[in-house]
UniProtKB/Swiss-Prot annotation:
Glycans are attached at N64, N159. Disulfide bonds: none annotated. It is a single-pass membrane protein. A motif (HXXHC 2) lies at residues 173-177. Keywords: Glycoprotein, Membrane, Oxidoreductase, Transmembrane, Transmembrane helix, Virulence. This is UstYa family oxidase phomYc'. The keyword Transferase does not apply. Belongs to the ustYa family.
Length: 254
């Protein structure tokens, strides 16, 4: 064999195994880096989306109904009604005129009757024999009864069922109503600040300002809902009998 065309190969001219693997490993490493970058980008997008969602949820204002349900036991009104809040400046100085205050007249008595009379409610969810009413109307009934009791010597309330009972029961009814109003006030615990105003005409030099900002539930809507769900028939007539309008008592001639 002619060996003239051959020449010796030096050791450094022979590629090592690692050098033979280098192109393949380089491609694999490049692919891995691309996947790593993609994973990091997706992870960043996911974290940003999660933080944005938490921010939106954390700053979203709950509805009036949602808030009310946190502060009240079950009520059919909170399931069916539209709880609307009203913000206004209340006029309530010491001698503020009102259709509900002052010496009893047929007009004042009628105004009070309209506040609470048609409150009976039947819930068809539990069958036709489930009867009840919203507590606000019981509270108004109690306040009205205490008001009438303070004027019982000046006005003829003989047609009011509560006053036809024995005096012990009448007194018990009044005390029950006072307790009901006390508990209601303490339960609500209105924390609206009442500020003082300078008033040189007063000995103390100041007076309380009861004309304050208020945020209240829309009572008209609550009343409309109660009337729309009121029981009709004899029951309503029997309930209404306890608030029959009276007439001013005639003073005895001497």
């Amino acid at each position: 064999m002619d060996r003239s065309g051959y020449f010796p190969v030096l050791d450094e001219d022979i590629p090592t195994k690692s050098e033979l693997r280098l192109p393949l490993e380089s491609k694999t490493s490049s692919r891995s880096r691309r996947w790593l970058h993609l994973v990091l980008v997706l992870q960043s997008v996911l974290i940003i989306s999660l933080l944005a969602s938490l921010h939106i949820l954390g700053n979203r204002q709950p509805s009036n109904i949602t808030c009310a349900k946190q502060l009240s036991p079950y009520s059919p009104y909170l399931e069916d009604g539209d709880l609307e809040l009203e913000e206004f400046t209340e006029l309530n100085h010491l001698m503020q005129p009102s259709p509900y205050r002052g010496q009893p007249t047929p007009e004042i008595e009628e105004a009070w009757v309209r506040l609470w009379r048609d409150y009976a409610h039947v819930s068809t969810r539990y069958g036709d024999d489930m009867l009840g009413f919203l507590n606000v109307f019981h509270q108004l009934h109690c306040l009205n009864l205490v008001r009438q009791y303070t004027y019982r010597d000046d006005y003829d309330y003989s047609n009011v069922t509560a006053f036809r009972a024995p005096q012990e029961l009448v007194r018990g009814h009044i005390d029950h109503c006072i307790e009901t109003i006390r508990k209601s006030i303490m339960c609500a615990s209105d924390v609206t600040p009442v500020v003082f105003q300078l008033d040189d005409s007063r000995k103390s030099g100041f007076k309380s300002d009861f004309n304050m900002r208020r945020t209240c539930r829309n009572f008209d809507k609550i009343q409309d809902w109660a009337v729309a769900n009121a029981v009709q028939g004899d029951f309503e007539k029997n309930m209404a009998s306890s608030c029959t309008l009276s007439t001013p008592r005639e003073k005895e001639k001497t």
